[in-house]
Amino acid sequence: MPLSPRSAVTASMLIAALALPQLHSNAIAQEARPAAPHADRAKSAAEQTDTVASKAEASPARAELNSLPPDVTTKHSIALPGRTLAFTATAGSIRLYNGKGEPQADIAVTTYKLDGADPRNRPVTFLFNGGPGASSAWLQLGAAGPWRLPIGSSVVASSPPVLQANAETWLDFTDLVFIDPVGTGYSRFVASGDEVRKHFYAVEGDISAMAVVIRRWLEKNDRLASPKYLAGESYGGIRGPKVVDNLQTKQGVGVNGLILVSPVLDFRDLSGSSLLQYAARLPSMTAVARQQKGKVTRADLADVESYARSEFLTDLVKGEADKEATTRLADRVSALTGIDKTVSRRLAGRFDTREFQREFDRDRGRVTGRFDGAKLGLDPFPDSSGSHFGDPSADSLIAPLTSAAVQLTRSTLNWKPDGSYELLNGSVAEQWDFGRGRQPLESTTQLREILSVDPSLQVLVTGGLFDLAAPYFGTQMVLDQLPPTLAEKRVKFVVYPGGHMFYADDAARQSLHDEVKAMMK
């Protein structure tokens, strides 16, 4: 029985990142000021991405037919507790070219600049989500932007997509630039053909494109001297360190800090035959079970973290050939997660995420979320032997977030591209070239390198206790392998009671705001 299209899209993504009435902010309604058409699209060598040996059709006529409209700038003001923020928003795009100077893609970029700030001292932060295939709406409308959409546990697909002023906006202390990689948001190819897609829908092509967009924005806005930060969520944990490395070594741009939200840093620990994947997930699965009885903090999971590092791994390594060790492990995992002992023994205490989601509350026909295991939803096929369910913690957010992003862009920011807005584009993930080979994809190598290249670089890593897509303990295990000479006092890891989008919680969102602000002081 196949997954529904909606469930298939969500299940294929590694990120969560997600007709709205007129915004109820006190935005100052002004005439939009369009930028000169394609003013920044000169085909100089400095503005080219890595060479694409392309068979793409990239004629000027075709490029203009597919292109995004000129940039639009508007003025706004929002009243927040204890302060009012006046700012300038620009919605538009940056065009990318191949090594022949042929147009390849228009990358949608949304910028917010605080009015009256000195650009020499004012930080600027570039934000992107993951997927691959996710737009930046998750971070913009969920955590950092001047407006946000409530995405808490009460949200359902039909919830009104009404934005509100974001009291925890990062605009308090940094200008914001949200980037939608090609195929997400309104970003699109202006050339056709398989080669251009293969270039951008691949790890290295994606990294190169993101780095060039950031450099181009800095040049266009005369902000190369400003403090510069990057923030990425989920697969953004792969993008983030690699983009910083590209900026440092290929674009000639230094970066002051990197913020990683619920990141995946190393696929080796979360997939395939790696035994570490079971240790990485166990604390989050236990957190899901314990929160059913009351609030859970990371301190409450000290016992399971200790077990996951020690006896659990010892028994796991002994393998199923050691029946005593396997039974001992399975029974302990059953006690920690609440999964029936018979099921745990049948699976030898080795739960993958889908099995845990299905078995946790199977008697009542419910499944857990993947991005937030604490969110339970109905199993659409409880009578099936297979697992044919979506993600109750993410599926319900797609409609309201998409509608909110469209209305914000088209009505409030007055930028009106043709075509659909892609919040989560499953076709991007399906076509993505992860560069599979002997070495699975990871960014810890680049994390070490960027920390070594710049001894002043700061890194803030965050995660959610109930995140089953990017388990916090897996991140902890990766960070623990960093040499103290690189990580001490420079890499900070903060874990919140929440899921992948832990910032849906008011207290967590405020804490994230404060952590990022402290980092930029």
Please name every model-derived segment.
Residues 39-60, 101-201, 480:
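N-terminal cap/lid subdomain of alpha/beta-hydrolase-fold enzymes
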Residues 146-149, 244, 248-335:
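A catalytic-pocket lid/entrance helix-loop region that shapes and gates access to the active site
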Residues 208-226:
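Conserved acidic catalytic loop of the alpha/beta-hydrolase fold
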Residues 223-235:
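Alpha/beta-hydrolase fold nucleophile elbow
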Residues 323-469:
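Alpha/beta-hydrolase fold catalytic core
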Residues 457, 471-481:
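Short alpha-helix in the alpha/beta-hydrolase fold that links the catalytic acid
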Residues 483-500:
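Catalytic histidine neighborhood in serine/cysteine hydrolases
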Residues 499-508:
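Catalytic histidine-centered segment of alpha/beta-hydrolase-like enzymes
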